[in-house]
Amino acid sequence: MTSFGTPGGRITPTGSQRTVPGGKWSITEGDAQAIVTEARKAFFVMAGVLAVLWVIQIANWADSYHLTLNYGIVPRDIGRLPDIFTAPFLHFSWGHIEGNSGPLFIFGFLAAYRGVKKFFAVTLLVIMTSGLAAWLFEPANTVGAGASGVVFGYFGYIMVRGFFDRHVIDMVIGAIMALCFAYQFTVLLPHAGIGWQAHIGGLVGGIAAGWIFRDKRPRASGKTASAVTAARPVAGGTVPTRVDLPKKPGATGMQ
């Protein structure tokens, strides 16, 4: 957000007839198919979000950015508090929206590819936390706007989601994103004309979202997963690798 002064983790195949132990850290074939489906949805959702942002930007530019001035965040103005929900869609210049569009699409897609419904809940939370941080702590007589607070929210969510959901792939993605975009943390420090308060608020909201919206579904453990009985071919047929021993008449247990 920018402010301006105002005047276990291996893939284990499963099917209808068998379950392979993988524990809480495994990803089943069904999970993988669901991820692919949700990833397609995530791509189109983020493409739609960017399209909306750029349409708003064109209208805003044509109106000399009065939309930003009228619907951006004005710190500690009670009457402007609802503007925390409109400010992320508004920018101050073409360079401003261009700088936010790439990270917004990448982080938004990664935040959404495991479930678009959950993504919308995460988005609402980080909009509120980043907007409230800007409204409470940014300097007086300024207007704050821009999607960067939401970007930092997605960033925080992606970094911790894998740990809370216990998905190794998400943990790897979070680590890679943290390493590749570590320079972004410099924007959390105070800079003139930069709404770093919104960035911190978004980051905190994203981390909180990772915990609040973590996957609470029970996952099969290696101790409870059913065993797979295999058969190996031999001349004349197959010999099972496990058989039941016949009991003697009258036997009541192991001899």
State where each predicted segment sits.
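A detector for small-residue-rich transmembrane helices and their helix-helix packing motifs
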Residues: T2-G250
